[in-house]
Amino acid sequence: MAKIHVLLKKEELDSQRLPGKVVVVLDVLFATSSIVTALAHGAVEVVPFLNGEAALQEAARRPKGSYVLSGELNAVTLEGFSHPMPMALLGENLAGKALIYSTTNGTVALGKAREADHVYAAALLNGEAMVAQIERVHAGDTVLVVCSGSADNFNLEDFYGAGYLVSLFASRGSAHELTDAAVAARLLHDHTDAMECLSASRVGKMMLSRGLEHEVRFASQKSRFPVVARLEDGSLRRLAP
């Protein structure tokens, strides 16, 4: 029987315990939502970095016009970088290009998960595709659903996203052993509207105060894209259907 854990923040990841595990990273507002959206709109890869300096170094190694450089630090878009939110990235003509991407939490969480056997990026936007991939390829494996959080703090929207994934696992009828955190996440999801929950979160409130309701609403959509984003050799790519 597969076991599903939900970790409340990326700081709970223990690299020594990751071998043999499947890790699914969530940063609903907005890193993993942006990653899924970019791959759904033709980006050939998303290359996540821990900070803007490393992202700039990677960009310098690539031909101009072959990539989009995007990132933020503490919710402020980095100078010289494109805005890192999903709808903003849709205006960047990503088709056929790499997205070089640095964020405060989501890309850091992906980096912390790299010792796992398999690492994926997930959001509300690709929940069904993500769960189907795990059921098809990783049945029986231990799955860690990692909420990125913010600077060692719990984030409501990531926990809601984890609950959506757990709810989808349950709806498929497969037997899973759930930790208490996984059960709690599912209960939150099953009794709360997505937009309501995201808007009530600290990050969601901040985005709304900046006139970015459209970005929050976009990220609140469930299973809009049939995208599976897998991290391999430092790059997130869309798996073929």
Spans of model-derived segments:
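Structural motif
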Residues: 4-5, 21-24, 44-47, 65-69, ...
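Short acidic, Gly/Ser-rich segments with clustered Asp/Glu that frequently serve as metal-coordination loops
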Residues: 11-16, 23-37
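Phosphate/ribose-phosphate-bearing ligand recognition and processing surfaces
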Residues: 148-158
